[in-house]
From Swiss-Prot:
It comes from Thermosipho melanesiensis (strain DSM 12029 / CIP 104789 / BI429). The gene is rpsD. HAMAP family: Ribosomal_uS4_B (MF_01306_B). GO terms for biological process: ribosomal small subunit biogenesis; translation. Residues 98-164 form the S4 RNA-binding domain. PANTHER family: 30S 40S RIBOSOMAL PROTEIN (PTHR11831), SMALL RIBOSOMAL SUBUNIT PROTEIN US4M (PTHR11831:SF4). This is Small ribosomal subunit protein uS4.
């Protein structure tokens, strides 16, 4: 299955909620979801009552779209989460939160995950001093993520830092914008990922069927 390359705002409208896929634009009056808060298409305004399966499916689709993950990879994340001890919901969230593209976004070096994925793919970041250009790379506690020296003047990175420098970071991360680096201190707790508008338990139930 190919990665979706169409308008990001259509994904928000399809899921019936803001997924904040376009960064700061989502907070402005240019946000398409604010203007048309219904699904795209001729029947988008019609409200449909979802079955339990439909609710579970929508939860899965929403989480996949937030993190930009395709089905095969997302299923692998679930399978890893299910095999680990502890709360499977939290394990699944950790799997997607520790992706390098997500960590770059969370640290504030990109305005959204899509841009973070592109920046990582183009080799603009180091992990523990070594270049990593795989967006799905799994970051470990204690890993240092930094912008490559020759990439520090790239506009998307400079603009993101300017936008995010006064914002609070997630508690499992630390960042030093002056030196263009951050640390993935530890894995997040489920309750700490406060901006994830998804019933993760519904996803677990869907894959457990």
């Amino acid at each position: 299955m190919a990665r979706y390359t169409g308008p990001q705002c259509k994904l928000c409208r399809r899921e019936g909620m803001k997924l904040y896929l376009k960064g700061e634009r989502c907070f402005t009056d240019k946000c398409a979801f604010d203007r048309r808060p219904f699904a795209p298409g001729d029947h988008g305004r019609e409200k449909k009552k979802l079955t339990q399966y439909g609710i579970q499916l929508r939860a899965k689709q929403t989480m996949k779209r937030i993190y930009g993950v395709l089905e095969a990879q997302f299923r692998r994340y679930y399978e890893k989460a299910a095999k680990k001890s502890g709360d499977t919901r939290e394990n699944l969230v950790v799997q997607v939160e520790r992706r390098l593209d997500n960590v770059v976004y969370r640290l504030g070096f990109a305005v959204n995950r899509t841009t973070a994925r592109q920046l990582v793919s183009h080799g603009h970041f180091l992990v523990n001093g070594k270049k990593v250009n795989i967006p799905s790379y799994q970051v470990r506690p204690g890993d240092v993520i930094e912008v490559r020296e020759k990439s520090k003047d790239i506009l998307p990175i400079k603009n993101a830092i300017e936008l995010n420098k006064d914002k609070n970071r997630m508690p499992w991360l630390s960042v030093d914008f002056e030196n263009y680096k951050g640390v993935y201190e530890r894995h997040p707790k489920l309750e700490e990922v406060i901006d994830l508008p998804v019933d993760v338990q519904a996803i677990i139930e869907l894959y457990s069927r």
